[in-house]
């Protein structure tokens, strides 16, 4: 059983929901990434999604595009992301870490080498944004052989066929994008989320995490009534952008604690 699967079983047994924050490796500073990861855990995160910066993040809105540009300016690569996970693992062997990014850096490294090095670094899951399930059957199989959960995106526009395809090859959890558009979009409709999630559950018992449009404790709590976990990304990036000098780590921990408390209430 993978670390992510075990975590969701434990959450279900205790009646809790998962909290999955997204931060980007190298933003706002590569030297701070591991410290921010530990702050996420102290705040009550269940899984950490660590973003691998890419020069053309097509699924991301302006907030995450800005962070990708900053991280790339700092020279962050897929290799340095793996080094950050390795450093994080020196103090935390338990919290699952999912790498989230685009196919190009993985293709440049090679899927086989990536799987080997990611597992050695302590990566538990991988979500390749531009890798739809019907095109990534072999990639998913390679990840599973290496002991890494392949995680896939589904959206309001996903056909039942695509839902079935993702259900067949995904493990860990499925990331349901709660609205059309790019990350950081607003106008979250929790009723729409609640109506579509049962269609996914018809095909799989894999936990479902919902992201896009979740920006505060209230929206996280509302989504959690139908989802197994909530994902928060753009709001965290905004918080880190706006945090006074020297206060980013504490601001992040406080924000995550507020979300965790709301989910547990």
Curated annotation (Swiss-Prot):
Family: Belongs to the TrpA family.
Residues at the active site: 49 (proton acceptor), 60 (proton acceptor)
Protein name: Tryptophan synthase alpha chain
GO MF annotation, one: tryptophan synthase activity
Protein's job: The alpha subunit is responsible for the aldol cleavage of indoleglycerol phosphate to indole and glyceraldehyde 3-phosphate.
Pathway this chain belongs to: Amino-acid biosynthesis; L-tryptophan biosynthesis; L-tryptophan from chorismate: step 5/5
InterPro entries, per the entry: Aldolase_TIM, RibuloseP-bd_barrel, Trp_synthase_alpha_AS, Trp_synthase_suA
Signal peptide: none
UniProt-listed CDD domains: Tryptophan_synthase_alpha
EC number: 4.2.1.20
Catalysed conversion reaction: (1S,2R)-1-C-(indol-3-yl)glycerol 3-phosphate + L-serine = D-glyceraldehyde 3-phosphate + L-tryptophan + H2O
Gene: trpA
Subunit structure: Tetramer of two alpha and two beta chains.
Uppermost EC category: lyase
GO cellular component, one term: cytosol
Keyword field contains ATP-binding: no
One Pfam short name: Trp_syntA
Keywords: Amino-acid biosynthesis, Aromatic amino acid biosynthesis, Lyase, Tryptophan biosynthesis
Residues in coiled coil: none
């Amino acid at each position: 059983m993978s670390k992510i699967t075990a975590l969701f079983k434990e959450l279900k047994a205790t009646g809790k929901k998962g909290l999955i924050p997204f931060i980007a490796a190298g933003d706002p500073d590569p030297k701070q990434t591991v410290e921010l990861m530990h702050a996420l855990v102290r705040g009550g995160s269940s899984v950490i999604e660590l973003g691998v910066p890419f020069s053309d993040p097509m699924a991301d809105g302006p907030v995450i595009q800005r962070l990708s540009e900053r991280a790339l300016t700092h020279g962050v690569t897929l290799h340095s992301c793996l080094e950050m996970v390795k450093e994080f693992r020196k103090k935390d062997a338990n919290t699952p870490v999912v790498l989230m990014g685009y196919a190009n850096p993985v293709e440049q490294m090679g899927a086989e080498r990536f799987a080997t090095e990611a597992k050695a670094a302590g990566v538990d899951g991988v979500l390749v944004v531009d890798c739809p399930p019907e095109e990534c059957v072999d990639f998913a199989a390679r990840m599973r052989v290496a002991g890494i959960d392949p995680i896939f995106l589904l959206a309001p526009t996903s056909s039942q066929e695509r839902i079935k395809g993702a259900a067949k090859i995904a493990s860990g959890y499925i990331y349901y994008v709660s609205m059309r558009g790019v990350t950081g979009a607003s106008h979250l409709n929790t009723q729409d989320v609640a109506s579509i999630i049962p269609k996914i559950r018809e095909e799989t018992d894999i936990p479902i995490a919902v992201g896009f449009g979740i920006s505060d404790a209230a929206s996280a709590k509302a989504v959690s009534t139908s989802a197994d976990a909530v994902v928060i990304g753009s709001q965290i990036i905004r918080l880190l952008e706006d945090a006074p000098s020297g206060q980013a780590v504490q601001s992040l921990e406080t924000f995550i604690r507020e979300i965790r408390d709301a989910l547990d209430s």
